[in-house]
């Protein structure tokens, strides 16, 4: 249940991965179907140590999802740029303007109307999680329903939410990659989760997704008065981009260290009231960061 399983996955992809062309034009080495299991019960959180992971960015992203927002402006205000490439690409394609990412983000911050027009990602994660538009005209808050079920009927096998709204995929900047989250409560009150990720960028995306999923599980357990159990991650198309192969080999050569600990320092009444300051991470001792370009 340690970082070694991530490194084994990397090794398997490098050794056995199918060479594939993809929509980004970069190309990948890909395996189909993978699983990892992480024990969160002792306060450990799966933040990789074989390279430094900017875990606060991943937690800020999860808090943004939970807010229901779909505009990058709140992220950019916090110094989070992980979603800026997609609206920037749309802006450049539609206007012909050759702004840098830094210049684009500066305009997002300085101009409310510009941010409203060009900073929105469409009906992505937060919209589907908190305001799913049903065919009956009703709006469904999947997160609120999940928390209520965790409290009132913890033995339910229907405790899940997802973002794959087929009717709105065409309007999303990027269809959901981490798309289904399912939850399970043991008879002794431990919350387990299973995340299904249809598409996993193993070098850049997956380390963030693991942090986000663990942070979400901690918040849900806190809201429902439960202890933490296992986080199970499953992937569909699990891939390494060709321009990340050297970085992955460098990471494989490093010896993993113990995962850090996560403690929630405050216990708000609502899942939308958590702040980044509520997440105390201790004992994180990673190897140096390894850089890699995002495939858009």
UniProtKB/Swiss-Prot annotation:
Active site: 177
Biological or metabolic pathway of the protein: Pyrimidine metabolism; dTTP biosynthesis
Pfam families: Thymidylat_synt
CDD domains xrefs: TS_Pyrimidine_HMase
UniProt enzyme class: transferase
Cysteine disulfide partners in this protein: none
Residue numbers binding (6R)-5,10-methylene-5,6,7,8-tetrahydrofolate: 201, 295
Gene Ontology molecular function, alphabetical: thymidylate synthase activity
Keywords carried by this UniProt record: Cytoplasm, Methyltransferase, Nucleotide biosynthesis, Transferase
Reactions this protein catalyses: dUMP + (6R)-5,10-methylene-5,6,7,8-tetrahydrofolate = 7,8-dihydrofolate + dTMP
Gene Ontology biological process: dTMP biosynthetic process; dTTP biosynthetic process; methylation
Keyword presence, Signal: no
Organism superkingdom: Bacteria
Record has Ubl conjugation as a keyword: no
UniProt cross-references to NCBIfam families, sorted A to Z: PRK01827.1-3 (NF002497), thym_sym (TIGR03284)
Self-association state and partner proteins as the record states: Homodimer.
Record's protein name: Thymidylate synthase
Source species: Zymomonas mobilis subsp. mobilis (strain ATCC 31821 / ZM4 / CP4)
Gene: thyA
């Amino acid at each position: 249940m340690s970082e070694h399983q991530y490194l084994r996955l990397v090794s398997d992809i490098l050794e056995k991965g199918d060479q594939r062309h993809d929509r980004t034009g970069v190309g990948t080495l890909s395996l189909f179907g993978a699983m990892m299991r992480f024990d969160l019960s002792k306060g450990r959180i799966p933040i990789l140590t074989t390279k430094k992971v900017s875990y606060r960015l991943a937690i800020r992203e999860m808090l943004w999802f939970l807010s229901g927002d779909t505009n990058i402006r709140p992220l950019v205000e916090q110094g989070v740029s992980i979603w800026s490439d997609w609206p920037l690409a749309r802006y450049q394609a539609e206007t012909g303007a050759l702004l840098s990412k830094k210049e684009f983000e500066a305009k997002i911050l300085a101009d409310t109307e510009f941010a409203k027009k060009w900073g929105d990602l469409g009906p992505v994660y937060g919209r589907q999680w908190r305001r799913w538009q049903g065919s009956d005209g009703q709006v469904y808050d999947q997160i609120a329903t999940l928390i209520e079920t965790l409290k009132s009927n913890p033995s339910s096998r229907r405790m899940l939410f997802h973002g794959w709204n087929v009717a709105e995929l065409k309007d999303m900047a990027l269809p959901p990659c981490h798309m289904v989250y399912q939850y399970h409560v043991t008879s002794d009150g431990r919350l387990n989760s299973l995340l299904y990720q249809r598409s996993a960028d193993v070098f850049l995306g997956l380390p963030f997704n693991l942090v986000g999923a663990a942070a979400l599980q901690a918040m849900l357990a806190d809201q429902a008065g439960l202890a933490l159990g296992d986080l199970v991650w499953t992937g569909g198309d699990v891939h390494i981009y060709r321009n990340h192969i050297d970085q992955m080999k460098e990471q494989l050569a490093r010896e993993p260290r113990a995962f850090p600990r996560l403690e929630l320092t405050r216990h708000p009444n609502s899942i939308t009231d958590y702040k980044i300051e509520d997440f105390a991470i201790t004992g994180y001792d990673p190897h140096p960061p390894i850089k890699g370009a995002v495939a858009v």
